[in-house]
Amino acid sequence: MEGIRRQEIRASVIAGAAAEQNVWTRSAYRNDGSNTFIVISSGHVSNSNAQNGNRCAPDRTGASPTEACGTAAERGETGAGSRDPEPERADQCRGDADAAGTRSAAVRPGPEPKLEPGELNGVVGFLALRESARECRHGVMWKDSTASYMLNLSERTLAMSRKLQDGTFRCGKTREFDITRPKRRTIVSVGFADRVFQRSLNDNSIYPRMVHGFVKDNAACQKDKGTDYARERLKEFMRRHYRRHGPNGWVCQIDVAGYYPNMRHDVAEAAFARKLPPEIMAMATAVMRNQYPGEVGYNPGSQMIQIAGISVLDPLDHMAKDLMGIRNYIRYMDDAVAILPTREEAERAMAAFGDTLHTLGFELNPKKSRVYPLRDGIEFLGFDFHLTDTGKALMFVKPSNVKDMRRRIRRMARLAQTGKMYRSEVDGSYQGWRDHASKGDSFGLIRRSDAWYKGLWKE
């Protein structure tokens, strides 16, 4: 196939590794196959775009991916059934832009995934789609499209199920809009019928298959995980480091430059292809290529892209945990923190992380990726973490967060005082920030903020 060349790539992503290792076989959460759409900080399922940790549902933007890499058996080559103990090599997905030598990280170890009995019917069957519609309606029943679909639920579900089974179902058009908090980004919204199908596909097949084999400290967008989980794990790592090495240590913190905008479609599809059977993979690629044309980049808005977001960097997690043996490592989407005893180890980790990201088509964000002393504190997921001389891990709200809150609440209070907004809306917004601050060691800050908030209404 034009644009696809065979090239052996090493399973070990550490330069100079003495032996190749299959780093995808470990399963930290073997029983964590529960369905989920999007999780808030506590890990509970939530359809509300405003209530999850990213302030938006998943993602969108891009280009049509190149063909996914196949196994030797799929290509009809001899030796596909060999019992040779050496790990199976993968084809390399390379388009015209890859001629310069950019390597694909698409390695599919082991046999091709197979459908479980009843799995396909559990995705496109009537009962599965009906349950998916009932889950998707939460928080959006005020929309005409949702109300119309639910009013004719049985008829619409039966029609969709038949189209999916005979191959005539087509995804609808998407709609783009911008959000400004917590940072400016473009969101892609899909129609309610498409959401019903995609949720059934993701919840009943893609999500449970993809999370199988994740390391425990891949913390984003999974059941029983989330921002609260990631923060508590980081605090535990700081205490563990103190018990072994005292208060002195070094932090290797990385951030991927433009994670979703720079995500290559062939890499995202290859991550899915390693774990999804061909029937499910065909539906997944149809959705992704319809919603995200091009070859590079996604924008938030799709549940499937959020799953891709937590899956694409799985090789990085296994390199850190399994190959390098870094126990004190946590990753939340594209932000990762590793705590190490010496500066030399932290710098080696930074170099290895950068090399691995490069093979996946990413680069480190030079402003946010750095090696620094543990005593300086760690900024992670909206809080500043500090380790005391007695080994206690403290978590404080970032000062910039407090400043933004006061500016926003002050503006809302003025609108309420002029009759342009209900005070209950202002109270709700302040209470939301207060709940966020209460997750940290913020007793004094909350007491001062409460006094400040009461004073707003006396002006």
Question: Language model features by range: what are they?
Answer:
Residues E116-E119, N202-P261:
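Active-site-proximal segment of RNA-dependent polymerases
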Residues E67-L158:
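Non-catalytic, polymerase-adjacent accessory regions of viral genome-replication enzymes
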Residues E2-G70:
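C-terminal, surface-exposed recognition/capping segments
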Residues K163, G167, E232-M333, V337-G354, ...:
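Conserved polymerase palm-domain catalytic core
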Residues C69-C93, A97-R103, V190-G191, R195, ...:
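Right-hand nucleic-acid polymerase module
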Residues R184-V215, E295-K321:
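Conserved pre-motif C helix in the palm subdomain of viral-like polymerases
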Residues K173:
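Extended, charge-enriched "interface" segments that sit outside catalytic cores
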